[in-house]
Amino acid sequence: MNIRYIKNYLASKVGCHIVVKYYGSRNKRERYEGVVYQAYHNIFTIKLCGGEIKSFSYIDILTKTIQIYI
């Protein structure tokens, strides 16, 4: 898997339901559920159920800081 593949994949999924699991430092884990909102050059955004918008980097997927489920 490479960055180009991830960008193209997420760009094709704009408007689709997504679950993002974030694995931070010190065992901090968060789960976000929403819709793929935009796919930009370096980041992608998701619109959460409450209307909040979160952004993530494609590098986060490669480094396994986040996992996505579509």
What are these regions (language model features)?
Residues M1-R31, K47-I70:
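Short glycine-rich, low-complexity segments
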Residues N42-I46:
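Short aromatic-glycine-enriched beta-strand elements
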